Amino acid sequence: MSRVCQLTGTRANNGMAVSHSHIRTKKLQQANLQNRRLWWAEGKRWVNLRVTTRALKTIQKKGLGPYAKSLGINLAKL
């Protein structure tokens, strides 16, 4: 399973690790993904999603149904 948020599509970021002597090496900054079982009120059922913690905060604020609708995601297919 790839490390991608199922709602926002967030992926790993390519960055640099910089040492004290300023030697730079490539590194991946992974998204903070969590497997969560979320209640979808409109569908009256639980939905298993792999989402970032940032998306979880937005879900708490807006609700799962309206947030998924604003992103153009059909939760019935998940």
Swiss-Prot record:
**GO cellular component terms?**
ribonucleoprotein complex; ribosome
One of the protein's GO biological processes: translation
Q: Which is an annotated GO molecular function term of this record?
A: structural constituent of ribosome
- Entry keyword set: Ribonucleoprotein, Ribosomal protein
User: Known InterPro entries for this protein?
Assistant: Ribosomal_bL28 (IPR026569), Ribosomal_bL28/bL31-like_sf (IPR034704), Ribosomal_bL28_bact-type (IPR001383), Ribosomal_bL28_sf (IPR037147)
Q: Which Pfam families match?
A: Ribosomal_L28 (PF00830)
Q: PANTHER family per the record?
A: 39S RIBOSOMAL PROTEIN L28, MITOCHONDRIAL (PTHR13528), LARGE RIBOSOMAL SUBUNIT PROTEIN BL28M (PTHR13528:SF2)
Family (UniProt): Belongs to the bacterial ribosomal protein bL28 family.
Q: What is this protein called?
A: Large ribosomal subunit protein bL28
Q: What is the lineage of its organism?
A: Bacteria, Bacillati, Cyanobacteriota, Cyanophyceae, Synechococcales
Q: Which gene encodes it?
A: rpmB
